[in-house]
Amino acid sequence: GLIDVRCYDSSQCE
């Protein structure tokens, strides 16, 4: 997500 700069693709984020 844009808020968590470590994870640009929200699909990759849990």
Curated annotation (Swiss-Prot):
Expressed in which tissues: Expressed by the venom gland.
Protein location: Secreted
Keyword set includes Lyase: no
Keyword Disulfide bond: yes
A single GO molecular function term of this UniProt record: toxin activity
GO cellular component: extracellular region
Alphabetically ordered keywords of this record: Disulfide bond, Ion channel impairing toxin, Neurotoxin, Potassium channel impairing toxin, Secreted, Toxin
Modification comment: Contains 4 disulfide bonds.
Family label: Belongs to the short scorpion toxin superfamily. Potassium channel inhibitor family.
Function: Blocker of potassium channels (Kv).
Descriptive protein name: Leiurutoxin-3
